[in-house]
């Protein structure tokens, strides 16, 4: 099936490999975002470098959807691993996405749920299946599960313990996916999150992140490129 694929990464390092693979790319710079609209391996692709954090990701995702009209969204990049089976370089694939820093439980909502939105944003099952298949084919260790987002870099035992208490099944944490998922939900556009682990979230995760971000970017980009071949 020929689809146009929207790909979103927060940082330049997370989209650089994909950007270098693009041909016939038109560049759109708007509101602090960079959008590259072209092709990778004969697949129509719109690649967004959104900037870091949920607001930047939401702004960028909405602009990407409006300006380039992709059929589906893949969120790529790095994440902090909380699942015991995840190590640096491994792949995490979303089965659900939630905000970990939203709290309107005083009004009867679930932790992480925002009014007029579901508690969890569910990715497209076909996209999840394609991601799992390509990860297995590439030989990466992968975990599929809950990815939680917040406007905080998670390191330190206290933060980790709080997130695990609120979301016992959390596999990984990062800073954009829930915002991207929420915008996709609003626009009724299918999505999936496919990220590689740059750090195992602990008190030294900020040091690990700097060291292993290039590996995470490489591995997550490899899976995204493999996924594209399913839609050419």
Swiss-Prot record:
Keyword Chaperone part of the UniProt annotation: no
Q: Where does substrate bind?
A: 80, 154, 175-176
Task: List, alphabetically, the Gene3D superfamilies matched.
Answer: Nucleoside phosphorylase domain (3.40.50.1580)
Q: Name one GO cellular component term.
A: cytosol
- Catalytic residues, chain numbering: 14, 199
Q: Which reaction(s) does its UniProt entry say it catalyses?
A: S-adenosyl-L-homocysteine + H2O = S-(5-deoxy-D-ribos-5-yl)-L-homocysteine + adenine; S-methyl-5'-thioadenosine + H2O = 5-(methylsulfanyl)-D-ribose + adenine; 5'-deoxyadenosine + H2O = 5-deoxy-D-ribose + adenine
* Any matching Pfam family: PNP_UDP_1
UniProt pathway annotation: Amino-acid biosynthesis; L-methionine biosynthesis via salvage pathway; S-methyl-5-thio-alpha-D-ribose 1-phosphate from S-methyl-5'-thioadenosine (hydrolase route): step 1/2
Gene Ontology MF, one: methylthioadenosine nucleosidase activity
Keywords assigned: Amino-acid biosynthesis, Hydrolase, Methionine biosynthesis
What EC number(s) does its UniProt record assign? 3.2.2.9
Entry-linked InterPro entries: MTA_SAH_Nsdase, Nucleoside_phosphorylase_d, Nucleoside_phosphorylase_sf
Q: Name one GO biological process term.
A: L-methionine salvage from S-adenosylmethionine
Q: Is Cell membrane among this UniProt entry's keywords?
A: no
The record's annotation in HAMAP family points to: Salvage_MtnN (MF_01684)
Entries under NCBIfam families matching the protein: MTA_SAH-Nsdase, PRK05584.1
Family membership noted in the UniProt record: Belongs to the PNP/UDP phosphorylase family. MtnN subfamily.
What the protein does? Catalyzes the irreversible cleavage of the glycosidic bond in both 5'-methylthioadenosine (MTA) and S-adenosylhomocysteine (SAH/AdoHcy) to adenine and the corresponding thioribose, 5'-methylthioribose and S-ribosylhomocysteine, respectively. Also cleaves 5'-deoxyadenosine, a toxic by-product of radical S-adenosylmethionine (SAM) enzymes, into 5-deoxyribose and adenine.
Q: What is this protein called?
A: 5'-methylthioadenosine/S-adenosylhomocysteine nucleosidase
**Which species?**
Actinobacillus pleuropneumoniae serotype 5b (strain L20)
* Gene transcribed to yield this protein: mtnN
């Amino acid at each position: 099936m020929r689809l146009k694929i929207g790909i979103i990464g927060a940082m330049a390092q997370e989209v650089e490999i994909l950007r270098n693979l693009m041909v016939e790319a038109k560049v759109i710079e708007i509101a602090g975002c960079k959008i590259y609209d072209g092709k990778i391996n004969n697949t129509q692709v719109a690649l967004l470098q959104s900037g870091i954090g949920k607001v930047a990701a939401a702004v960028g995702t909405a602009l990407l959807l409006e300006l380039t009209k992709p059929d589906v969204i893949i969120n790529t990049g790095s994440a902090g691993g909380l699942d015991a089976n995840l190590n640096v370089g491994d792949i995490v694939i979303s089965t659900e996405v939630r905000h970990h820093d939203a709290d309107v439980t005083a009004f009867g909502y679930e932790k992480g749920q925002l009014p007029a939105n579901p508690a969890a944003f569910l990715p497209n099952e076909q996209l999840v299946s394609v991601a799992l298949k390509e990860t297995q084919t590439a030989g990466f260790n992968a975990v599929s599960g809950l990815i939680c987002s917040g406007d905080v870099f998670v390191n330190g035992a206290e933060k980790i313990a709080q997130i695990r208490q609120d979301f016992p099944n959390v596999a990984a944490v990062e800073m954009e996916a829930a915002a991207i998922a929420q915008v996709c939900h609003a626009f009724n556009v299918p999505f999936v999150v496919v990220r590689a682990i740059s750090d195992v979230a602990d008190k030294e995760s900020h040091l690990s992140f700097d060291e292993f971000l290039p590996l995470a970017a490489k591995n997550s980009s490899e899976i995204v490129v493999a996924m594209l071949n399913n839609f050419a």
